């Protein structure tokens, strides 16, 4: 492990996504739940590939039911898509399911070429790290609580930008409300291990 930027330790990715847990109480109101949600005539919600991409740029703070739902789908490589959909059925009136962009071919790394699929597959987007399932397990948070409660947010940042920490250091945000910042906690743990290894 090599420190290549101030206060940044290089791992296997250049993203700095973080689960933020605050002391904010309660769930979103029904009106807040609907923010960013559009139901088409068939009462389905379109999940476009371009809206399921969360990388190190641009900087984003995901703090709505809708945006966290998209992140959960993308960051789990689609593993949580069905569970997210069930939660939407519970909270979004008249919701009739997600409709994803589909792919008809994918890259075969053994053959080193694109191959046609027998059947189209949903495109679930992507992230650099695919951390959502690990976060929920590590902090003992259910997917439903993560999506519906105000206290959970996600920061999408890059370690070459560090926009989130520039914002925190500016004094614009009251940091006293932040209980956990997963990326910072992991970085601090790496620093402790690095320091301990150098003592030997």
Regions found by a protein language model. Give the residues of each.
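Long, non-globular targeting/processing and low-complexity regions
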Residues: 1-2, 8-10, 15-200
